[in-house]
């Protein structure tokens, strides 16, 4: 789904429900930025311009993570794959066991821009605010840190992110769309309803 569709929020909820690790490329990349290493500074510049990280770099980061012992019973990928080459690489990972369930969260461009303009992030742990209560009190549910506007919330950056999404990520729908494990969910619903819709879709796929 597009930026602002609620992928991160749903990923946290689903990982807790299924008791599997939530593997967020965003979290891994933010840790690199915080380290202020050469790699971190490169990542920071790309994120702030609204671009996407190089396929080879992010694919290697994910591949190494999926070699961990905690993914044996399943895992939830958040932020990967974003491009067809990344998806092709994921299909080739030797660590995968069983079919991938792919969920697309659909949201209109108008709703995307509205949500992204209001996005907040924790200044301490880097987690996105997940609901209106967090935003109202400007406090992170996870660590109690202060919420601040995201660095990529400027209007031109938002438009750049949408253009990147249309150019590089939309083709993933064509790549995965014909698979029986592909699900599409309306992201304009209330958060709880989106979660319920995803769970129903996943149950239907697993029953096949």
Task: Please identify what each model-predicted range represents.
Residues 1-208:
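Glycine-rich phosphate-binding loop of ATP-dependent small-molecule kinases
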